[in-house]
Amino acid sequence: MGDSQGPGDSGEPRDSQELPGADAGGGSPAAAVFDALGAEYERAFAASAAHRESLERLLADLAPGSRVLDVGSGTGRPTARTLADAGHRVLGVDVSPVMTALAARQVPEAEFRCADVRDLPLPEGAFDAVCVYFSLLQMEREEQRELLERLARSLRPGGLLVAATVPVDAAGVDAVFMGQPVRVSSFGAEEFAALFARAGVTVEWEHSALFIPDHPAGAPEPQLFLHGRRS
């Protein structure tokens, strides 16, 4: 279920002014869940072939040195790590202080901010790509709709929106995820794809998978990956 200034090549901080505002993470239910899970989450999902395929497709579509926003960046791996290794400029945002600290250590080439993306300004056209891997599921449905529209506007024309979710029809359902209590909202596959269209993003690739997290409390979950382009 569901990424401070990083050093540039010269050793100086990269110029990353896309998201002004002070860091403000922690305190939310999602932060509590992922603070508790920490590196366990990365280990549980490390074998996801579908996530890797999604990242490979994204890399193939990005121009060199692209600016990428990673929403719900977690430990920084695999998303920020893969993008940074390819020379892209990555800004990760995550509500979990534990996850953000792990990411900063594991991917020092990227910048990570501990904050709730819903509270951050998202300047129009600031990014070449935005990744949202499984980071919407603890938001209410209307919050997901609104955030995807804001994220789409933060893309330059022709920019790429990449998202993954668990495609089930659920609104405020109490569940247990890797031993942690969560409240989940999501959309079925067709409804989720419709959110892209509503946001002005044309879906170019869609992939469904079934994944079992490598964790004692892991259970099979359907996964949906969408890649789209802003009109």
Locations of regions flagged by a protein language model:
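Conserved class I S-adenosyl-L-methionine
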Residues: 2-3, 17-64, 169
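Class I SAM-dependent methyltransferase SAM/SAH-binding core
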Residues: 69, 75-119
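A short acidic, Gly/Pro-enriched loop at the edge of an enzyme's catalytic core
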Residues: 118, 122-130
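A short glycine-rich, Lys/Arg-flanked "PGG" loop and its adjoining helix->strand segment in the class I
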Residues: 145-157
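Conserved beta-strand signature within the Rossmann-like core of class I S-adenosyl-L-methionine
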Residues: 158-165
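Short, glycine-/aromatic-enriched active-site segment of Class I SAM-dependent methyltransferases
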Residues: 166-183
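Short alpha-helix
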Residues: 184-200
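Conserved S-adenosyl-L-methionine
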Residues: 201-212
